[in-house]
């Protein structure tokens, strides 16, 4: 059992659920669902990580699958959700469904053993698109678009957690910075 990892993963899970509950309730239904798929897939992976770091090793495959789900379906949902935020669009069933189909397709493909190595590429490209959309939102003078840029910058810093290994435990650092990133995404849509 690694207590610090249990605490940091639990903090990430609580932050994801709490941010969704607190910040996203006023959004239109399908927009809220897109944000929810992003936040809650991360939270589900964090819950599985909490259990795994607590010493229960039976969830390793589930934990790996949930991480893949967050980096495929979650990323595709955040890209479309941020696009809708920047363009001030209300998502319809067709675009929502298409986003889910693309995300689930990416998830299934990334589960294949030969393709699994490309999972970081998919999430990196998705986060890059979110950053570009955030900058586009700043150019369009969208209120709170700066929070999208801050959230993406925090996500990028979290992925470089190994660089801070001398100062912090990389796994805990990743969890806490990603939790701050989720809060920044919440601040972006806050009224």
What does each model-found stretch correspond to?
Residues 9, 36-46, 75-78, 96-100, ...:
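Residues within membrane-spanning alpha-helices of integral membrane proteins
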Residues 9-21, 71-84, 126-135, 175-190:
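Hydrophobic cores of alpha-helical transmembrane segments in multi-pass inner/ER membrane proteins
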